Curated annotation (Swiss-Prot):
This is Galactose-1-phosphate uridylyltransferase. It comes from the Bacteria. One of its GO terms (biological process) is galactose metabolic process. NCBIfam families: galT_2, PRK05270.1-2, PRK05270.1-5, PRK05270.2-2. GO terms for molecular function: UDP-glucose:hexose-1-phosphate uridylyltransferase activity. The gene is galT. Pathway: Carbohydrate metabolism; galactose metabolism. InterPro entries: GalP_uridyl_Trfase_II (IPR000766), GalP_uridyl_Trfase_II_CS (IPR023425), GalP_Utransf_C (IPR005850), GalP_Utransf_N (IPR005849). It comes from Streptococcus thermophilus (strain ATCC BAA-250 / LMG 18311). Belongs to the galactose-1-phosphate uridylyltransferase type 2 family. Keywords: Carbohydrate metabolism, Cytoplasm, Galactose metabolism, Nucleotidyltransferase, Transferase. It holds the Pfam family GalP_UDP_transf. Its EC number is 2.7.7.12. Its main location: cytoplasm.
Length: 493
């Protein structure tokens, strides 16, 4: 039975917050302030808080009191959901009070709140296309990212005309907590951050609004300082996996081409997810002089990964530091490895930490950001022939075996399927050669098979993308060159 939309929303706010029935008129006026009184008579059949919020926004747009741009609606939507979101002081007090007796419950409660108040965009994330496919490196995870709305041309124009502001300095700064937002900066009224101390400095723990995996978290430094891989990085990642049970923690590299999209603010990512790289076996065990207590090996993975395991955090940090320092200064002309040119460093590491079976684990992924005439985008970057699927930087998440592919592929891959079935003769020019190859390989393909064939091919191409990003190739020659670097580490003081 249809009920009044505003009244139903207010009822849900009261049920999901510390507001009381006596606050109903006050809350109703808060809603009218945000979406306009023109929605007063709109009815609804829904009782889900986020659905009700969306309906209020749609009603406001129809009434002319809410802007048509997604960014304008997000600003108002976040304010509506802020009504059920406790103050930062309350969020932090609740988290740490619960943490004393049950860390897992504290984390679970904060995650539940972040979903309930629509900070983690559960409905939007559900639109993503996601699947696993077997490759020679095990099952890889493929996602076509449809959760983030693409920029409307009107929004792009509005952003260009917006008054310039450097507050907050970036999207990771602590000052985003409760920030209203603007056309060119996301709405954060319902954003909350759990503070914690690391090395006697303030850090923040939050969830990613457009999560790429389960409980996708961000751990960021309280000050706006650039990312830097150092011995401190290894210690911090291990501290995080100790403090947040069941979570991994990793860092993007700190150099262009091989780094992530935000290099201006020190931060790490984590979450409760088992990535393909984690379950990849050891291709060859290695040993490091003076570290017989640390298990070490080269991982059977398309990228160049050393895995270290020990019960002793400090021993892992010491060895990882030695490997990092050696890699930063290591060159091997035959292997195409160059530490620096014209004073510009080329080498860094993408580190990932876990705690498993009572031991700490560090994966150190060797990165090299050289470019050349043949590979202007990066020698160890997706090469031209696979850029029709993935041309962006290979960051932390992809390194671990989860492809984040652009929204354009949803329709482009459907066109490729139709082309293979003979139901269309038009594919995007960048896919033409690939589509022709698939057609030649599958001349009698059926409608029941076509999606699986295309999806499998995308996964195989992603495996190639990771091979391109790998410094040492996965053949015997590459393994020998990798072991030569291990020998170099052992010869270092």
């Amino acid at each position: 039975m249809a009920e009044n939309l505003v009244n139903t929303f207010v009822t849900q706010v009261i049920e999901n917050s510390d507001y009381e029935e006596l606050d109903r008129i006050y809350l109703t006026n808060k809603v009218f302030t945000l979406v306009g009184e023109g929605v007063a008579d709109v009815e609804t059949d829904s009782s889900e808080l986020i659905d009700l919020k969306d309906q209020l926004l749609q009603a406001g747009v129809k009434a002319g009191s809410v802007g048509e741009l997604n960014e304008e609606q997000d600003i108002i939507g976040a304010q509506l959901m802020d009504l059920i979101t406790p103050r930062p002081s309350v969020v932090n007090r609740n988290f740490w009070d619960t943490y004393k007796s049950n860390p897992e419950q504290a984390i679970a409660d904060f995650y539940a709140q972040s979903k309930r108040n629509d900070y983690v965009k559960v409905k939007a994330i559900a639109q993503n296309i996601a699947y696993k496919a077997p490759t020679k490196y095990g099952d890889l995870e493929i996602t076509i990212n449809l959760s983030k709305p693409e920029k409307d041309p009107k929004a792009i124009a509005a952003a260009k005309n917006a008054v310039a502001s450097d507050y907050p300095k970036c999207q990771l700064c602590m000052e985003n907590e409760g920030y209203l937002g603007r056309i060119n900066h996301p709405a954060r009224s319902n954003h909350r951050v759990v503070r914690f101390q690391m090395e006697d400095k303030e850090w923040g723990f939050q969830y990613s609004p457009y999560a790429y995996f389960n409980e996708h978290s961000i751990f960021f430094y309280g000050k706006h300082e650039p990312m830097h891989i150092s011995p401190l990085t290894f210690g911090r990642l291990l501290t995080i996996v100790e403090a947040f049970p069941g979570y991994f923690a990793g860092s993007n590299a700190d150099l262009p081409i091989v780094g992530g999209s935000i290099l201006t603010h020190e931060h790490y990512q984590g979450g409760r997810h088992t990535f393909p790289m984690e379950v990849a076996g050891i291709k060859e065990k290695v040993s490091f002089d003076g570290y017989s207590d640390v298990e070490a090996g080269i991982v059977n993975w398309p990228m160049s990964v050393l895995r270290l395991r020990s019960e002793d955090k400090e021993r892992l940090i010491a060895l990882a530091t030695k490997i990092l320092n050696c890699w930063r200064g290591y060159s091997d002309e035959k292997a195409g490895v160059l530490a620096e040119s014209d004073g510009q460093p080329h080498h860094t590491i993408t580190p990932i930490a876990r705690r498993k079976d009572g031991k700490f684990e560090l994966d150190l992924v060797l990165r090299d950001n050289q470019t050349s005439e043949e590979y202007p985008d990066g020698i160890y970057h997706p090469h031209k022939d696979v850029q029709h699927i993935k041309k962006e930087n290979i960051g932390l998440i992809e390194v671990m075996g989860l492809a984040i592919l652009p929204p354009r592929l949803k329709t482009e891959l459907k066109d490729v399927e139709d082309y293979l079935l003979g139901q269309g003769n038009q594919v995007a020019p960048i896919h033409q050669e690939w589509a022709d190859e698939l057609k030649a390989q599958n001349p009698n393909i059926t409608a029941e098979e076509v999606t699986e064939v295309v999806r499998q091919s995308v996964a195989d191409i992603f495996a190639r993308v990771l091979e391109d990003a790998g410094v040492y190739k996965t053949n015997n020659e590459g393994l020998d060159q990798f072991k030569a670097f291990v020998d170099f580490v052992n010869l270092a003081d």
